[in-house]
């Protein structure tokens, strides 16, 4: 009996495993049915099914899943599943959104039935996931079903895989799922309800299916079709012809493939060079491209029609898009070749083999879609009531809102809509009236199209079906029930239509009326008369002859801008001159394009009335609300400047920035609405295009622009100061603006007259055809059609805001090709360009049907494109029915199905065959299951990227079909079993943990590592993108180059590194330990261990962009000198987070505290490398336990111990190397890794990073300069502080000189770290370097670490448990390091820290990450800021904190609460209030930390607790490292050990520290796991810690002061509070962010993090876990932070942060915090980081490892699980990890985190570019429609339509209306171009930084004069870019402020007019 019972139980477990591991739809259903049969369960009983299943399946793997589902189901909104118990729901379509909706309805207790037309999931296409979707799916147990789910930095998943996950969850919850059932319609309730009470039913096929008998109260359409459910009207969004191509290639999961960098998205507007190179090399012309590595290699791109025609993909050019893309008109072989060529080029030919995966027809999986038109449903739901039965009908997914695929919004908005629909059903079931239900649903739906990852709520753990938890400012009662009555269908369709018409009219009539009042010619004439009244010789009586003399125009301009025209000097007789003067000034100063020339005006008898109306209307709209100058004669100078600014056009502003723009003032309100992230702004612009029926849409822009402009102008009064400042800056910028743009743009003004050889303004300059007023554009005195305005070289359509004009030949070019003008046209000249699309080709257009009535080609699109026509319903298209029926992909799939069946008679290939062919390697290796298993396993997996490839993998699909029989023969269960066999054990461990959040995060991290291991490829991916992508230049280009150079340098330097032997040992160790041979091999093999890592690091750096570079620089800096230190610290105040850079700091410290911060930045570079590390951090996390991911940012020190797990260490080590090789050189500096572990090595590390750093630095430099960089150089304790303090004030002055000095110093330091003779800029640095480079670093670090220790001793008590151990161990090291340090002196002490920075790096890296991330965020865009609420402040605060530590510390603390610990340290300044503020900040940061890190935070915090204190203290000391020689004793115990370690490592060698480090790591891991065991515990601890920190800060103040007195003399008072604060902070952070504060390394992290930014610190420290998971990006940020330079960069790149604010509203705070924090944060942060990490990298690593283990155990794993893992790890990984290895691990983690952060940043920037691109296309299409209507009206008015000339008032009224709309579109376009310009500058800045980094990697004495001059040139150019961005941001900010007050009224007005939706 017992045996049979056990057998049955085991059988159930096997069946459950088979179900979980099933990889096909049918296999899943079959496995589930078998499980239910075995357990004797019947899914029909939906209410109790799940509970019965749970009770009968007592399996530890299942329990982890039950725990997750129980947690989700226990949410109060579901009311224990009793809300909808009597509600029956039918969901059409088992796609991701349909299944997600079903799950929520099931949790509400409803009876849910899902019907799916097919029985196979065959879509390999990849979906981008927003952070909240990842969190949501994790909560549903996604990782239990798919172990690789979003591991590491992965943020995407294939549709097939996502469907499988959701299908399994749905089945477990008792949802009925029927496949092969097609919905055909609704069956109304019969009229005879007396005999049979039958409700609503579904008509399905097959008709006899049981579902046809079901009755439903709710039906939800989620099948992606547009017409499945009737009654939903659709809004059409039409852009330019958009042809999308998707391609899936087989992914064999080889090492080579793993190394290929993903392309998260590249848009033409974002990276033109890449696409131009692609076109020149292959003839392929794309708008954008995305590459995701998933089950397949997935590519999706938007191709230009002409390119497809040229390449023979499309055979004939048709106007109708359906004909154009029909199978008969497409050459499939050419299409395959086209897709393969594009994929090959975009990945830099690095994918070894591009074999197509097969679709479900056995054909290559390549498809082409028409995305020209996209639709959104006007409503989300409606109610039908027939014969007494009500039916709630709703839409979700693509059926509701079609996404623009490059935006990656589809699945996220689909999930949001699914939750909103569930909430609606809940309200419905609770008895709410139908109209109220609909009103609430529509109120919520209006927000959906505006959602972005930045403007949804950030507290993902609070998400529920309640909209309030997801939308920050939702008003669920926005619409009244009476406003949705038309959605209540009672069967009387007549009434419904009448109601709808009334509603539409009520919405649009007011707007039209207003437009009419504005448009009346009498009103315009009256306004002109008032403006010209009193001017001599001016008498305006009409809109024609009165203006001929030109005086009236000049009078209007003079009235508002008397500074532009000397009216009294004008001669009334000189008509031509007067008019030309007015035209030129209006274009140049006001952005109003001329409609004719002065000569033309003088030559005509009577000016053309239509042209004059068009022209004067622009003046009216610009000045109507402005105050005439005469009335302002009594204004003071400032107010007058404000007035001038108010009439300045953004376009003219842009042109002065080197952008040739000639347009009207920008539609500020739309600009922000569209791009800001803020829903409101978006709404407005959106409303134009989508809210109401197309008929009224035209008027909308007018309303929007009118309202906006008026309010904007009215609000000018007090908000113009910013604009005034921007105007003031213009003069400077005009001098600095890129010569090309300036020259190019203004050249035209010289020659404004209309060319004599042409007819005039009514003749096109290009095609010589008639140009009507409405379609007329002018530039450089030429008039032309919009469609004729193309680049002479490449035929790309130009915009007035971005072109280059060659005066010598009168030709126009796109900016990238302006330099080709002398070399003649390229192979593809304009003729080829015509291909762009029939619509775009000027001359060739005529042949296409696009030519319009006027006989000229249609301006906008080729006939094909136009065919869709403006009609809302698409009636003009033959394919209307199809278009209304399905989405682009569905139409293509259906066409494909029909054509394939007809032509080839192919049948569908079974899902199993398809999966076997496409995913053979994955299936064979059981990767999915294994990955999911456990963190250790994940790590292993991660480290073994190469997976065995299946024999079938490369087999052609036909061959696969042949094997079909065999495949079928093998049951899916067997396949799954074999697949998951490997995953079994480890997976079990993982799942046992159940609460695998941390575990998952670990896995994620590990997998991310894997990913990132591929990211070694990652760097390459970037390279691929970046190199080819100079277009990608924004982020990639520079970085790639840098990476390569760095790698080469590394290869050369590796031997030179101070500890070449050590580095190599570390590499070897890493290899040995690493269970990821692939990664290691790749790294080692490719670059001699260093090379590959270098690539990885580079990648990370690239991703992190600025941060890693800074970190690297910092590393180099230590060797550099005080001078360098000054610069570095200024720029690298943020670097402090780069505690990794401590080694650098050490030397720097010696030179100058400021410097040291920069050095940390150097370490930061590793932190950035953390991009790589971030990939590795997961491994560390696994090793560490849950912590590694989160830890990676702060607990990195622990992480190394955690990393002791075989994989983590290996990862870490490579990562460490990678960090060292942020610049390629780093790789060769395995010693660099050692530096992470040992102090000497940091030098090399620094060296490598330095190159990277310099570019980064250069960018941050300005900010740093602002911060007391100079003081940092003082490097001496007192001086540093004071200097820092003063530095802030001297921000501007310091900027350039500091930058230059910083670069020199960096360069020297880099050389040192590389092992070359560094240029000693300061005795300190020389001293540090005197000892072996490592030793020098240790020496400098040593004193610092001592100081830190002094500070730390108090923290140690707090840490007690861990701290005690940590402290004890550190103590021995401390003694050692103290001696070293003492001899070395404070500087050397710092250096010691530097060398220990390896460890410190770990800790630092985590902390660094925070700053890095912050910095990264800042630099990339505010968008990054959102991920970490603290970041916005941190960016500013980070710098402030660092600088502040010396001088602003106190202040900054208050300003930047998030990084209180850091702040606390910075407050070392004597000011006590600042200290208090710091304390407060700390508390706040602590509180924020838990929030930011969520569970992960808690975990990290616990782990870090001990260390946090220390690290905080250390950090505090760090700022004034020079002052801290004495503190070294206190620090010695905890941090001292780090220093001792560092020194001993340097002196004794890694071995001594190695054992200790291991032990410490193990202890720390355990402690952390324990502390993080439960989220609640963590949160509580975090809160307690924050309180304790405050108290401690107060208490510690006294303690700390004494220790830091010597060095910190200046900052001693703040230091006191700071010290205590750091401890408390450390304590809190330990709980919240153990990595940073808890260990020496952690401490360093904390300090750097703290310094980099409170928010960041918070995130990183408190998000050990979060770092791993949701915060991983933040963690990355930290690694980035580590390159605090990134933070500095933020400060330096204020424009970036400002830009961010433009989008996310962080600008104000950021500015404030930036100003303050930048200065102090870099130096203090850097100093602290350097000292602490250096203190005892190894021991800390060990402690950290222990803590990580304990933390991860607590949070995710059961203690047993953790122990099991630990033992496994022990067996797997030789416990002989040396400090180097541990450091390498940490470094890798840091790199991964940085890489991850950078990737997110790039993705956000990409999305911004794509938003702009898409909106520009919308504007272009709308302008084309307006032009067509305008031409028709103009012809009628002129009598050209064969009707004779008419002066019909109605026609004139229509003309006025069209003119207004066009003006609105012009303004809107100019706004978009400003945003595009900002992106361009951001990109340029990024590239320059990278180039500078690379150059700084070479020692100055090895450079030629030319090279040195080039460095200076690059620096100057970068400063110019920063200034331009500042000015742009100031302009945007001013506009934002002006709109702030109007927003509420404007939003209300717009919404009331129907402008509520803006979808893209």
Curated annotation (Swiss-Prot):
Zn(2+) 1 binds at residues 764, 767, 785, 788. GO terms for biological process: actin filament depolymerization; cytoskeleton organization; exocytosis. The keyword NADP applies. Residues 518-624 form the Calponin-homology (CH) domain. It comes from Bos taurus. Residues 1394-1406, 1594-1611, 1633-1653 have a biased composition (Low complexity). FAD binds at residues 97, 116-118, 123-125, 183, 298, 398. Residues 2-494 are annotated as: Monooxygenase domain. The modification Phosphoserine is found at residues 649, 685, 687, 971, 1129, 1139, 1156, 1188, 1250, 1254, 1286, 1313, 1404, 1660, 1663, 1870. Its EC number is 1.14.13.225. Zn(2+) 2 binds at residues 791, 794, 814, 817. The modification Phosphothreonine is found at residues 887, 1252, 1317, 1425. This is [F-actin]-monooxygenase MICAL3. Residues 762-824 form the LIM zinc-binding domain. Keywords: Actin-binding, Cell projection, Coiled coil, Cytoplasm, Cytoskeleton, Exocytosis, FAD, Flavoprotein, LIM domain, Metal-binding, Monooxygenase, NADP, Nucleus, Oxidoreductase, Phosphoprotein, Zinc. It comes from the Eukaryota. Residues 984-1014, 1485-1503 have a biased composition (Acidic residues). Residues 1654-1672 have a biased composition (Basic residues).
């Amino acid at each position: 009996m017992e045996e049979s019972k056990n057998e049955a139980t085991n059988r159930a477990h096997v069946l459950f495993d088979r179900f979980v591991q099933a990889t096909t739809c049918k296999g899943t259903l079959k496995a589930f049915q078998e499980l239910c049969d075995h357990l004797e369960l019947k899914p029909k009983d939906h209410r109790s099914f799940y509970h019965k299943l749970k009770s009968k399946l007592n399996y530890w793997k299942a329990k982890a899943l039950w725990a997750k589902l129980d947690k989700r189901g226990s949410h109060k909104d579901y009311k224990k599943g009793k809300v909808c118990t009597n509600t029956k729901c039918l969901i059409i379509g088992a796609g991701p959104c349909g299944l997600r909706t079903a799950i929520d309805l099931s949790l509400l207790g409803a009876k849910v039935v899902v019907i799916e037309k097919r029985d196979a999931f065959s879509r390999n296409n990849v979906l981008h996931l927003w952070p909240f979707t990842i969190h949501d799916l994790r909560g549903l147990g996604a990782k239990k079903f798919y172990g690789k789910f979003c591991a590491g930095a992965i943020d995407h998943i294939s549709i097939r895989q996502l469907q499988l996950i959701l299908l399994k969850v749905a089945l477990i919850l008792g949802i009925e799922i029927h496949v092969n059932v097609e919905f055909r319609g609704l069956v109304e309730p019969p009229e005879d309800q007396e005999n049979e009470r039958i409700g609503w039913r579904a008509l399905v096929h097959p008709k006899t299916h049981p579902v046809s008998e079901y009755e439903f109260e709710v039906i939800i359409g989620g099948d992606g079709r547009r017409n499945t459910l009737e009654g939903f009207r659709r809004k059409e969004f039409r852009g330019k012809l958009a042809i999308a191509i998707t391609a899936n290639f087989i992914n064999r999961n080889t090492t080579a493939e793993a190394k290929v960098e993903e392309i998260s998205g590249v848009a033409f507007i974002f990276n033109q060079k890449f696409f131009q190179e692609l076109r020149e090399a292959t003839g392929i012309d794309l708008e954008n491209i995305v590459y995701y590595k998933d089950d397949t290699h997935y590519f999706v791109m938007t191709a230009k029609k002409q390119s497809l025609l040229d390449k023979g993909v499309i055979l004939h050019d048709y106007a109708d898009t359906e004909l154009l893309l029909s199978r008969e008109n497409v050459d499939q072989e050419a299409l395959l070749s086209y897709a393969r060529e594009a994929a090959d080029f975009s990945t830099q030919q690095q994918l070894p083999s591009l074999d197509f995966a097969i679709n479900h027809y056995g054909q290559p999986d390549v498809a082409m879609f028409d995305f020209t038109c996209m639709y959104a449903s006007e409503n989300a739901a409606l109610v039908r009531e027939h014969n007494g039965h009500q039916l709630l009908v709703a839409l979700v997914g693509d059926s509701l809102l079609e996404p623009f695929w490059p935006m990656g919004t589809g699945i996220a908005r689909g999930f949001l809509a699914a939750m909103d629909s569930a909430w609606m059903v809940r309200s419905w079931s609770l008895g709410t009236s139908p109209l109220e239900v609909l009103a609430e649903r529509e109120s919520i739906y209006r927000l959906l199209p505006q959602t972005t990852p930045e403007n949804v709520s950030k507290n993902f753990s609070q998400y529920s079906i309640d909209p309030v938890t997801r939308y920050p400012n939702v008003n669920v009662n926005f619409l009244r029930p009476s406003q949705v009555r038309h959605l209540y269908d009672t069967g009387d369709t007549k009434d419904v239509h009448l109601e709808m018409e009334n509603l539409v009219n009520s919405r649009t009539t007011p707007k039209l009326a207003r437009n009419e009042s504005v448009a009346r010619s009498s009103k315009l004439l009256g306004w002109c008369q008032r403006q010209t009244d009193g001017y001599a010789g001016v008498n305006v009586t009409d809109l024609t002859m009165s203006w001929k003399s030109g005086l009236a125009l000049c009078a209007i301009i003079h009235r508002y801008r008397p500074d532009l025209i000397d009216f009294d000097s004008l001669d009334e007789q000189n008509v031509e001159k007067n008019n030309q003067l007015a035209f030129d000034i209006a274009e140049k100063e006001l952005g109003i394009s001329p409609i004719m020339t002065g000569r033309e005006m003088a030559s005509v008898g009577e000016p053309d009335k239509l042209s004059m109306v068009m022209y004067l209307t622009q003046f009216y709209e610009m000045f109507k609300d402005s105050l005439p100058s005469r009335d302002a004669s009594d204004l003071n100078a400032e107010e007058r400047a404000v007035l001038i600014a108010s009439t300045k056009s953004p376009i003219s502003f842009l042109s002065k920035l080197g952008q040739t723009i000639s347009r009207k003032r920008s539609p500020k309100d739309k600009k922000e609405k569209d791009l800001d992230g803020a829903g409101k702004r978006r709404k407005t612009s959106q409303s134009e295009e989508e809210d109401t029926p197309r008929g009224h849409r035209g008027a909308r822009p007018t309303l929007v622009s009118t309202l906006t402009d008026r309010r904007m102008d009215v609000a000018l009064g007090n908000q113009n100061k910013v604009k005034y400042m921007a105007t003031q800056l213009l003069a400077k910028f005009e001098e600095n603006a890129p010569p090309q743009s300036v020259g190019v743009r203004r050249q035209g003004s010289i020659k404004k007259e209309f060319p004599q050889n042409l007819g005039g303004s009514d003749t096109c300059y290009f095609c010589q055809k008639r140009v009507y007023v409405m379609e007329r554009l002018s530039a450089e005195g030429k008039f032309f059609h919009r469609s004729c305005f193309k680049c002479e070289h490449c035929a790309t359509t130009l915009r007035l805001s971005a072109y280059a004009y060659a005066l010598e030949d009168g030709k126009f070019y796109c900016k990238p090709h302006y330099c080709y003008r002398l070399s003649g046209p390229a192979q593809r000249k304009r003729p080829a360009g015509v291909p762009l699309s029939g619509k775009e080709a000027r001359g060739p257009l005529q042949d296409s049907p696009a030519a319009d009535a006027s006989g000229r080609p249609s301006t906008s699109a080729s006939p094909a494109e136009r065919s869709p026509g403006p009609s809302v319903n698409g009636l003009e298209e033959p394919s209307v029915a199809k278009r209304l029926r399905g989405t682009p992909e569905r139409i293509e799939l259906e066409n494909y199905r029909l054509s394939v069946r007809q032509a080839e008679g192919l049948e569908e290939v079974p899902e199993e065959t398809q999966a076997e062919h496409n995913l053979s390697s994955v299936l064979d290796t059981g990767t999915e299951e294994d990955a999911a298993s456990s963190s250790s396993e994940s790590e292993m997996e991660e480290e073994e990227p190469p997976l065995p490839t299946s024999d079938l993998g490369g087999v052609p699909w036909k061959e696969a079909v042949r094997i079909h029989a065999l495949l079928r023969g093998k049951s899916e269960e067997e396949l799954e079993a074999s697949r998951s066999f490997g995953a079994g054990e480890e997976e079990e461990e993982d799942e046992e943990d159940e609460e695998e959040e941390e575990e998952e995060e670990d896995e994620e991290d590990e997998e991310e590592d894997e990913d990132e291991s591929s990211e070694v490829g990652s760097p390459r991916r970037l390279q691929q993108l970046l190199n080819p992508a100079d277009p990608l230049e924004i982020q990639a280009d520079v970085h790639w180059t840098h990476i390569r150079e760095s790698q080469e340098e590394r290869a050369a330097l590796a031997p030179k590194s101070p500890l070449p032997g050590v580095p190599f040992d570390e590499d070897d160790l890493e290899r040995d330990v690493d269970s990821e041979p692939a990664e290691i091999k790749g790294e080692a093999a490719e670059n001699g261990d260093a090379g590959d890592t270098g690539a990885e690091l580079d990648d990370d750096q690239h991703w992190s962009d600025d941060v890693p570079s800074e970190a690297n620089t910092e590393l180099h800096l230590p060797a550099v000198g005080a001078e360098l230190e000054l610069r570095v610290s200024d720029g690298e105040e943020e670097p402090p987070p780069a505690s990794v850079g401590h080694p650098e700091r050490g030397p720097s410290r010696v030179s100058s505290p400021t410097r040291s911060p920069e050095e940390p930045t150097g370490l930061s570079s590793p932190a950035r490398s953390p991009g790589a590390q971030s990939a590795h951090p997961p491994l560390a996390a696994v090793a560490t336990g849950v912590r590694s991911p989160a830890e990676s940012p702060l607990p990195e020190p622990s992480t190394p111990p955690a990393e002791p797990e075989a994989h983590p260490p290996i990862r870490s080590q490579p990562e460490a190397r990678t960090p060292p090789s942020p610049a390629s050189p780093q790789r060769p500096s395995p010693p660099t890794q050692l530096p992470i572990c040992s102090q000497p090595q940091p030098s090399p590390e620094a060296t490598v990073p330095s190159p990277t750093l310099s570019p980064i630095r250069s960018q941050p430099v300005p900010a740093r300069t602002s911060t007391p960089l100079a003081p940092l150089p003082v490097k001496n304790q007192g001086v540093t502080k004071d200097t820092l303090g003063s530095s802030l004030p001297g921000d501007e002055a310091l900027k350039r000189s500091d930058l230059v000095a910083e670069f020199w110093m960096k360069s020297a330091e880099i050389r040192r770290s590389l092992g070359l003779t560094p240029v000693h800029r300061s005795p300190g640095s020389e001293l540090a370097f005197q000892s072996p480079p490592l030793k020098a670093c240790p020496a400098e670090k040593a004193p610092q670490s001592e100081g830190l220790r002094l500070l730390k001793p108090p923290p140690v008590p707090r840490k007690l448990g861990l701290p005690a151990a940590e402290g004890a161990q550190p103590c021995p090291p401390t003694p050692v390091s103290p001696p070293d340090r003492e001899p070395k002196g404070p500087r050397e002490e710092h250096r010691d820290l530097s060398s220990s920075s390896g460890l410190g790096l770990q800790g630092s890296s985590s902390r660094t990450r925070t700053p890095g991330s912050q910095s990264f965020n800042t630099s990339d865009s505010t968008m990054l800021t959102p991920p970490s609420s603290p970041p916005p402040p941190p960016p500013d605060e980070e710098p402030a904190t660092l600088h502040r530590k010396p001088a602003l510390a106190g202040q900054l603390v208050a300003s930047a609460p998030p990084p209180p610990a850091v702040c606390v340290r910075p407050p070392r300044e004597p000011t006590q209030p600042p200290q208090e503020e710091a304390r407060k900040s700390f508390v706040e940061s602590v509180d924020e930390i838990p929030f930011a890190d969520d569970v992960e935070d808690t975990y990290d915090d616990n782990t870090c607790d001990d260390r946090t204190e220390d690290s905080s203290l250390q950090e505090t000391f760090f700022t004034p490292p020079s002052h801290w020689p004495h503190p070294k004793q206190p620090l010695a115990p905890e941090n001292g050990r780090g220093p001792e370690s560092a020194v001993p490592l340097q002196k004794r060698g890694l071995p001594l520290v190695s054992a200790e480090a291991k032990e410490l790591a193990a202890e720390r891991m355990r402690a952390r796991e324990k502390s993080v065991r439960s989220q609640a515990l963590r949160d509580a601890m975090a809160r307690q810690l924050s309180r304790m920190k405050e108290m401690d800060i107060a208490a510690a103040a006294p303690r700390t002061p004494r220790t830091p007195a010597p060095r910190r003399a200046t900052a001693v008072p703040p230091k006191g509070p700071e010290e205590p604060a750091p401890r408390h902070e450390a304590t809190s952070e330990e709980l919240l962010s153990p990595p940073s504060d808890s260990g020496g390394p952690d401490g360093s992290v904390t300090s750097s993090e703290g310094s980099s930014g409170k928010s960041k610190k918070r995130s990183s420290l408190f998000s050990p876990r979060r770092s791993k998971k949701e915060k991983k990006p933040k963690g990355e940020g930290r690694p980035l932070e580590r390159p605090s330079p990134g933070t500095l960069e933020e400060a330096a790149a204020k424009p970036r942060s400002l830009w961010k604010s433009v989008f996310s509203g962080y600008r104000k705070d950021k500015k404030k915090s930036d100003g303050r924090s930048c200065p102090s944060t870099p130096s203090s942060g850097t100093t602290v980081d350097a000292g602490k990490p250096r203190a005892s990298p190894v021991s800390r690593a060990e402690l950290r490892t222990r803590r990580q283990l304990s933390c991860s155990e607590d949070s995710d794993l059961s203690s047993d699980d953790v122990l099991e893992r630990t033992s496994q790890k022990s067996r797997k990984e030789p416990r002989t990890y040396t400090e180097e290895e541990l450091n390498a691990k940490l470094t890798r983690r840091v790199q991964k985190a940085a890489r991850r952060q950078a990737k997110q940043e790039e993705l956000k920037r990409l999305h911004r570019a794509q938003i702009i691109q898409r909106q520009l296309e919308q504007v272009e299409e709308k302008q084309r429609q307006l032009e067509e209507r305008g031409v028709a009206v103009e012809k009628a008015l002129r009598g050209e339509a064969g009707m004779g000339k008419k002066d019909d008032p109605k026609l004139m009224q229509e003309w006025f209306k069209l003119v207004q709309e066009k003006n609105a579109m012009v303004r809107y376009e100019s706004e978009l171009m400003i945003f595009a310009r900002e992106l361009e500058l951001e990109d340029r800045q990024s590239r320059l930084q990278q180039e500078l980094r690379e150059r700084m990697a070479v020692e100055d004495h090895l450079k030629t004069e030319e090279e040195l001059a080039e460095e200076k040139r690059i620096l100057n150019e970068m400063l110019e870019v920063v200034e331009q961005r500042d000015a742009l941001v100031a302009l945007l900010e001013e506009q934002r402020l002006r709109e702030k007050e109007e927003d509420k009224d404007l939003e209300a007005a717009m919404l009331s007019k129907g402008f509520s939706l803006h979808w893209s």
